[in-house]
Amino acid sequence: MARAPFLREFFVSDRPVGAVAPASAGLRKCVVAAAGVSTAGSIVELGPGSGTFTQDILRSRPSGAAYLGVEVNGTLVLTLQNRYPDLHFVHSGAEAFDFAAYCAEHGPIDAVISGLPWTSFGEELQCRILDNILPHLAAGGHFVTYSYYGFHLLANGRRFRKALSERMRFVATSPVVWANLPPAFVYVATR
């Protein structure tokens, strides 16, 4: 994965970009497996960025599974649309996208993979995003995201874990993926 668009957007975007470098193969494998992408009929990726996870999702998803990428950065949306012309990307914030209308057409969402920088968001935005997407998860569906190790101890990290736990039936964490830069772990929340 080319780092140039990723780094450029990190420095010039007026909205938070989730990482300075793309996720490692180990973190991507952990996230995609935890989300159950290989058996999902409908997959939503929040904040696909430059497409680091998108390629792994594309390789793992069943033939015919619906995919939607919701990205707030218009430059990255254009890059993604050019790289993955068969996938559907929208230029929108995750708090503003109409998931109800999307699900009316495509059915409930089986897997949500989020690359959003949750610890960069205040409590209000965290809750608005979660309240906009989580009600549209299928029963037994998974919401999967990751956090850099140590960031979960920050105030916004603690608030995010609490908000997720209040809205989901079950929340678990993976072991730390030390090979990622920086090291990270995965939240796996089940509806």
Give, region by region, the residue ranges found by the protein language model.
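Conserved SAM/SAH-binding beta-strand->alpha-helix loop
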Residues: 73, 95
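Glycine-rich SAM-binding Motif I of class I
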Residues: 51-55
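Class I S-adenosyl-L-methionine
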Residues: 155-191
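Conserved SAM-binding loop
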Residues: 80-81
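Conserved class I S-adenosyl-L-methionine
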Residues: 39-49
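Class I SAM-dependent methyltransferase Rossmann-like catalytic core
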Residues: 3-38
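A short glycine-rich, Lys/Arg-flanked "PGG" loop and its adjoining helix->strand segment in the class I
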Residues: 127-139
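Conserved beta-strand signature within the Rossmann-like core of class I S-adenosyl-L-methionine
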Residues: 137-147
